Amino acid sequence: MRVGIDLLEIARITRIAAHSGGRRIVFSTAELAYADTLGAVRCTEYLAGRFCAKEATAKALGRGLGQGLTWREIEVLADAHGAPQVLLSGGARTVAEQAGIGRIDLSLSHQGGLVVCVAVALPREAPAPASPCEAPAPASPCTDPHGTSPGRTAGAPS
């Protein structure tokens, strides 16, 4: 497992969000198509989140952007439930495959003019997360894994 994190002031993305040339270098057609459906403030927040997610993903891949990865090769779109999802292509996909990475999970949050993203790169053979409803029941506080009973020390006479 590899982890990448990035923190960004949303205001730093304002120039990129307003400049069509910069937008096309950093963001995919699908990312921009969705951003263009939003109002100006929300568009900037959305693009800042995607920028931050791309940075965190590159860190989780163990590379900086420009070191075998380009911005548009890391695409961040929403799944059916609105959660951010990473799609890799080109050099980014090659780097992930060579590192044995099967998927990258993201967590994004916006607060007070900042956006933070954590990217967790999981090995190809990593199972899907178990439902919290299916987690094994915790051991009873009265059950001792060493075969002793509460109030009795291992090896002490009964």
Range-by-range predicted roles:
Residues 1-158:
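Core catalytic alpha/beta fold that binds nucleotide/phospho-ligands
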